[in-house]
Amino acid sequence: MSEPRTLLVIAGEFPPLKTIGRIRTVKFVDQLRQHGWRSIVITLKPSGTEPNYDPSLMAEIVDGVEVVRVPIRNREDEIANAVKRLLGRKPAAPSVSAATVSGAAVAVAAPVATAPSGGLMDHAHAMTRWVLRSFVDVPDDFRLWADEALKVARKLCAERRIDAVYTTLPPFSSMFVGHALRRETGLPWIADYRDLWYGDVL
C-alpha cells in the first residue's frame, strides 16, 4: 500500500474559532483523508478569550489531521507599546476586537478603535492606524501572521514530505504563504477563494 500524500493547508479560520470559513476547510481535509491524503493545517493560535472561541469545536477535527498553530501579531499594538516605552509609560495589554473575515468575526488582539478627541496622541494614533491599514497591512490585518506562518511552512517543507500546498482565503494574507512556497519549492499550489478579494461580498 502506497504512503498517503500530504497536503499543507494554510487556513486562518479553523476550530476552535467559530467562523463560517472553518467549516469548508474541516470538511475538505476530511474528504481528502478518505481519498488517501493526510493534511497538516497551519492556522491561528487563539488565546481562548475570543468571543467566538468554542473549545467544543475541536471535535470537528478528524483524527490524523496535524494542526500547527501560529500566534497572531498586531502591528498597531506593537507600535503603540514601543512609543509608550519611549515615553516611560506602561505598555497596555492588548484588547480583543473582531476582524471581519469572510463575513464572520475572527477575534484577534487589537486596539479598540476610538474617535480622536483632538489631542496630539489621539491624532498620531489615528494617522498611524490609517497608514498601516492603507499601505502596510495589505491585503488585511493578518500580514504579520502570514509572515510567521511562512517560517513554519518552510520548516515543514524542509523536514517533511509535502506533496501540495492549499491556501484558503480569506484571510487573503494566506496567499503570500502559498505564493512563496510555490516559488521556492515548486510544489503545486491551490488557492481557494471563498470570498471576493475586494468589495462587499453582500
Annotated model-derived regions:
Residues 44-147, 156:
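A conserved catalytic-core segment of Leloir-type glycosyltransferases
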Residues 160, 200-202:
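Short acidic, glycine/proline-rich loop/turn micro-motifs
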Residues 135-150, 165-185, 191-194, 199:
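An aromatic- and histidine-rich active-site surface loop
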Residues 3, 9, 136, 150-160:
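Terminal low-complexity segments of carbohydrate-biosynthetic enzymes
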Residues 1-79:
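N-terminal subdomain of nucleotide-sugar transferases
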Residues 35, 160, 181-187:
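Helix C-cap/helix->beta junction micro-motif
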Residues 95-103, 110, 153-174, 187-190:
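Short N-terminal targeting/anchoring amphipathic segment
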Residues 31, 152-156, 181:
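A generic secondary-structure signal
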